[in-house]
Amino acid sequence: YGIPAYNFLKHIQSNYPGRVAGTEKETEMAVFILSVLLNGGYAESDIAIESFEIDDSTPMMDEAIQNVFDGGEKSNSSQNILITKKGESEKTIIVGAHYDSAGTHGVDDNGSGVSVALENALRMVNTPTYYTIQYVFFGSEEPGMYGSRAYVESLSEKERENIILMINIDTVLAGDYLYLYGGKVNDNGTVDNTEAVFKAYEIVKEIGLNIQLPPDGNNDYPYPTGQKRSDHAPFNDIGIPYIYFEANNWENGSPVETEKNGLIMHTDMDDLDFIENEYSGRVQNTLSSYSTLLYSLLQENNWEQ
């Protein structure tokens, strides 16, 4: 587990730097994802492309982000790539990862999530599952989760009812600790919808993976939730349970990602060569751990509460 993901990541590092929302590079990355899936055994009828508009005038992105690479001509449209693997049940698990990046190599954020999802999609193509699995590669997360918001807004009532779980994989390469988050924070600060993440954590312990829940006692992010700024948020907003995979470092109460270098995401350190030189063995370990867990979660047939 994790070796195919690593090979995808090396390809992304070399070929798709600066895949900023709406740019040619973002579109090229979408084409790459489609080619992997079509060559990996999925039929064209399993795949859908969902286009949507993006508004470039409201970037949520941090001004400090270094645009190291030019992603080419920019437009105000982007797309999600949807792949459906039918299970015995119509009840569906969404596996999501955004494929756009800041103006960097974007291997941590979020070539890593894309690579783990692609590896899993190829592994599952001929694997019988109880639940239907839909892989969604979201465009344009960085400027404000445009892809996941468009996806959730497009769902029919029936489709919403059928989605029992969303697994979001975002920035799983460089952080010091491997985390799982979940749960919906209520207005009074209590947290609901935690059954899925706690079940996932039990599976982590059964397998013996070095993945943990975030530290308890953080007033800004009630346990076991994490930051809202990723593609699980629109699903959470409509009450769909989620499990969010992210490598980070919360040991001192705020997410610094790495003790040694601070944030890797959104900086020019988001580069596979740099990460491998700085953190020997971390890349393979992280990809392997999350790939193993994802496969195990999708083998379960009792996610409905």
Regions found by a protein language model. Give the residues of each.
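Second-shell loop/turn segments in exported
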Residues: 1, 13-27, 34, 67-72, ...
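Catalytic-core environment of secreted peptidases
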Residues: 2-17, 36, 40, 71-136
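Extracytoplasmic/secreted proteins, especially bacterial periplasmic and envelope-associated proteins
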Residues: 4-11, 24-42, 47, 112-119, ...
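A non-catalytic alpha/beta surface segment that caps or lines the substrate-entry region
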Residues: 10-84
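Solvent-exposed loop/turn segments at secondary-structure junctions
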Residues: 18, 53-57, 87-89, 99-104, ...
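Structural recognition of the beta-strand scaffold that forms the well-ordered cores
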Residues: 46-48, 80-84, 92-96, 134-137, ...
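Acidic/histidine-rich catalytic neighborhood of metal-dependent amide-processing enzymes
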Residues: 77, 101-195
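Active-site-adjacent substrate-binding region
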Residues: 177-305
